[in-house]
Amino acid sequence: MIIAKNIEQFNLLRESFTKDRKIGFVPTMGALHNGHICLIKKAKSENDVTIVSIFVNPTQFNNPNDYQTYPNQLQQDIQILESLDVDILFNPSEKDIYPDGNLLRIQPELEIANILEGKARPGHFSGMLTVVLKLLQITKPDNLYLGEKDYQQVMLIKQLVKDFFIKTKVIVCSTQRQATGLPLSSRNKNLTSADIEIANKVYEILRQDNFLDLEELTNKINSTGARTEYIQKINNRIFLALYISKVRLIDNFLKETGPSC
């Protein structure tokens, strides 16, 4: 695996290493888990060259503490990527991605950008879309691999690719879960053993619920020691965000299936 630490290094690789070859791209913020690994394996199976980026994007954090406490395990991540035979790791600095500061941003006007996560985390989707556009302009992949857990993010990135005429196919992979139903997330690394017990209780409730009375469901979840930020049903999909201690977790799933593995 070749590691490109800045855009200049990456551009040299892009010109020599990827010419006339199909490129798959998996953008991450590091702290890799099996959800990322599934995306990477799919990318490798469908492309000639697989590129993974690790960049913790400061502009998509509306809470400075969340940014400061986001898990960082770069050396472990590198070992994981090497074991998966990833071709290129793009690991730029903030200065590389925002050389003149955050002067221009994508500001989504879609309804989906202003509800749920958009409402709970002002500026989050603007920062996310801005960095994704930058990464796509740099990597120029044929295929982009995303996880369904970040459902709103996926929908907005699809619109970004369409509206800016980007020649990249967006491929969405199903949410990877633990046996309890808890979705895999980098933030799970910040959960203590006591927090995990609470999370398991929450997902036991979710697996058994029929989602007809969301107020009652909210009360049940809060009784475990978790703190619900929102639970909403849109069309036939359940969206939720909750805190366990100081760790914020999000999820979504179809009403019929629940948070099944």
Swiss-Prot record:
This is Pantothenate synthetase. Disulfide bonds: none annotated. The keyword Cytoplasm applies. Keywords: ATP-binding, Cytoplasm, Ligase, Nucleotide-binding, Pantothenate biosynthesis. It is an enzyme of class 6 (ligase). Its EC number is 6.3.2.1. Catalyzes the condensation of pantoate with beta-alanine in an ATP-dependent reaction via a pantoyl-adenylate intermediate. It comes from Francisella philomiragia subsp. philomiragia (strain ATCC 25017 / CCUG 19701 / FSC 153 / O#319-036). The gene is panC. It comes from the Bacteria.
